[in-house]
Curated annotation (Swiss-Prot):
GO cellular component: endoplasmic reticulum membrane; ER to Golgi transport vesicle membrane; Golgi membrane; nucleus
SUPFAM superfamilies found in the cross-reference section: HLH, helix-loop-helix DNA-binding domain
Region (Leucine-zipper): 370-391
Protein's name according to its UniProt entry: Sterol regulatory element-binding protein 2
Primary gene name: srebf2
Sequence ranges on the Lumenal membrane side: 483-513
Family per similarity comment: Belongs to the SREBP family.
Keyword Transmembrane helix: yes
Amino acid sequence: MDASEFMDTMDPSLSELGDEFTLGDIDEMLQFVSNQVDFPDIFEDQMGGGATARTLPQAVPSAILTPPHTPVQTSSQTHTQTLTQAHTQTHTQTHTQTRTPPVLQPRPQPITQVQTQTFPMQTLAVQTQAQPQTVMITPTATPSRFIQNQVICQQNNATSFQVLQPQMQSIMTSPQVQPMTIQHQRVLTPAGQTIQTLSTAPTTVHTMSQQVPVLVHQPQILKTDSLLLTTKPDGTQVLSTVQSPTGITTLTTPIQTTALQMPTLMSSNILTTVPVVMGGGDKLPIKQLSSGPAHNIGGARVGVEQSPVVGPGGVVKEGERRTTHNIIEKRYRSSINDKILELRDLVLGNDAKMHKSGVLRKAIDYIKYLQQVNHKLRQENLTLKMANQKNKSACVSDVDLELKAEVSLISPPPSDSGSSSPAQLSPYCIDSEPGSPLLEHEQLKSEPDSPSCVGVMDRSRLLLCALSFLCLSLNPLPSLLGAEAPAGSPEVAGHGPTRTLFSLPAQTQSFGAWLWCVLPFLLVWVVSGVGVVWGCVRVLYLWEPVTPLHSPTSVRFWRHRKQADLQLYRGDYAGAVLSLQTCLSVLSRVLPVTTLDIMCSLSWNLIRYCLRRPAPLGWLVRLVGGRHEGEESQTSSRDAALVYHKLSQLQLTGQMERRPLWGVCVSLSAVNLCESAEGKLTATQQVQVYVTAAISVRAALGKHLTCLPAYLLSCAEALTCQSDSKPLPDCLRWIFTPLGRQFFLSCDWSVRSESDGQIFTSARDKADPIAQLHRCFCQKLLERATHTLIEPQSREDAGEFTGVLEFLQLLNSCTEDSAPSTAPFPALANQSSTSVRDPVCRWWASVLTAAVHWLQGDDASVRSLLAEAERMPRALHTLDHPLPKAVLALCKAVQMSVCPQKGEGVVSCLSHCQRASAQLHISVCQSHNNTWLHKGVELLVCDLLLTLRTSLWQRGGGSNGEPGPAPGSQLSGFQRDLSSLRRLGQAHRQAQHKLFLHETTVRLMAGASPTRTHQLLRHRTHNYTTTDGECVLGERERAHAILLACRHLPLPLLTPPGHRARLLAEAKRTLERVGDRRSLQDCQHILLRLSGGTTIAAS
């Protein structure tokens, strides 16, 4: 900015003063300032004057340089010894003589009239304050100057004011600039005091270098601000300052202006400015300057205001009015812009960019949205209040107090920060807000909890029921009614003329009269019984906790419930137990801890269940508690039932160490709450609750009192028949089948997760007893199928393999498409969200089915089934157990054996047999405490492997068609499998019969003595000769032994001649009965060959 532009922005009120300024005026002012050192007593420090005000020797007014013949009025404070002179006005005129200065000396000062006035001023508060002032004046062509001033003010108790002596001023200047000192002091006093301004100080000049006289040719002007005391229309007074900044201008040097700011106190802090203007040159016209910004300190609107300046003629200039108007408009626009920016930050955020109209439009839309939400919530709040008043009229006052305590309305800040109106509630403020995209956190409706939401222990309920039954047994009503009989009657006072029967008077001897006398007692007993039942029913709802919807209690419950779901999903069962217990505590429900609590809870749950189940009592329960069973009550019962149900599941599966009776109490609580929830639970969830309760009762009682779990199971089955929704999943449907019910009630099972079960079934939810029970059922079906395949039970069966296929078919139906059984909670990571299949169990079922068809001789079915069995599930590959690997190698060997290839097929089949034999040997050596299923599968695999080796040996015959001695590799493999069979025979009785058969076979394969082999076969066959009506263990092995003897032993050993035919006929009947078609075909071939040889010999 150049000098011309700066001059245009100067205050027009100073233009009339600048035309008369000369260099001599400025020099004389400098001399006046420099000569103030002659009065050192004025600036002595007066720090010790605390109680009394010291009087100055003389009053020194503020000197202001003005043009000639132009008087200027300044305000100063005159200190006197008394405070009564505070409102007097003293006019002093000082006359000085004019002199002509030399060329290098300041010219004489013209006569200057200084008028000092003292006027009262009203302030709010006065504080003692010492504030240093520092001014830095930096011309463009010269180094910087530092001007420092310090004013010390003190007020005593006598409401007088004292101006202390400022410190010595020190100025550091450069060699090219004349040192100077500028000092200004201003003091504001309370009402009734005066204002005094002193400007004097000795000056000390420190010269850096060049001790050469310097000609000061730039004038320096010092002008103070004036204080104006204006009166507002309402009668209050506002202190304002007229800021008159001046500028410095020279012909060749830019202007440098600096304002000295001195804080004073008026009700808080008032910031006024003291402009200092320095310049050089001859007469410099002072133009209009822009006023400084307003300062708002301490909440009071006290600022620097631009007031119109009166010219010599007393007329306000037009430019000054326009400047004042522009300043006011600029202030208004700045305030509006600030509020619009604040509104944008509230509605759109700090990063949003939008023009003013868009911000206002968004704010209007948001206000309308809040009004709609407020109206909706008020309507809902009114509805809930009316319902609460209708249901709980006795607690209306308490609820209203809680509502008043909880509802808090917050009004937005006023748009005008300077408004002094008290804060009022906004009509658009709401006490609750739903979630909206403009809010970061969803605020839920805050409602008071109902008085019935406080739960009690079950022992308190049981105590009330016991008291009711005690009243029924004692029945005090008849005694109370009997005490009201008249005491002065002759029948009571003395003996009557005749005898009485049953203490009845003579006129009541008839049956009708007797019944009329007994009827009141019967009515009393009936009324007492009904009252006791009604009291027990009332106990159901007296302290039954109910959680209001969308209340803080409901929010806390769902927060912990979701946390429990997440912990169950991650497998953190200990944390899930704590979260579920917290859920119950939020719902004001208490779990039993001690033995007394468990017994009381069990008794109360049984009483509660008995009150609902019978038809008359159930009708009474619905009649009494109908008005209590609202939507909130049913929802609370549903939430609590699911939590109790999950805790019972965790206790049953071993994830929570509690006693079995504790689990029974929790499961019965879930059943009762499920009955209270009614339609809030789906049919699948209700069936799960009842089945879990039956499992808990069955696990606690064992095989005793099986009628109780059977009753709960029948209730669950009745729910499945009543539901019209989609059918139950297979994981629940199997338990209602006859075989599933028999397994549940009579078999031994455990719902705790076991690692050994993962070999035969897929992994299930460790925290779901129904899933674990389903796993046990699948393992039981596999066990029954395996043992049925190993040993037949009776001849009444249609065939040995028929029962096996039935078990396997039921197993496939149970594992075909099973939905997840944990509907209220998310499935585990190893479960699918749509359906849960058991690929491991189905693989074992396909292997057993292929074994049955291979024994039956159905090679086509064997090839199709083994093609599927060769794709072993990934879970078994990951498990890396030797038994599934042995079974897989056996399946590949059987697959190669049924192929029509001869040479290469036999070699490949034997190699697979070697691998299967090695894995089986490892599995047998590792098994110590395995289940019957594990041992049965090992025995079956070993038997099938030995049977396959025997078949391969018989297939590779010699030149005459009969098989010769087996090679050493085949014989060593057969011996290793036989040793594994001997080891399994120690714990399994059926292995002894198979062991004798395969020991005979190995003698034939090795070419041992046929006489000793015949003796062994004859001893075994004679020991197992049975009657026609029985089928004992080892019958199939005896038939195979007969076939070996008739096929491989010499004919002379089988004497007499008819004995061989009888043995073959018996073996044929046995093989037909067990369904072994492959061995039956061999038996028929031998019979045909035997009959052909007999015919030729006879001819």
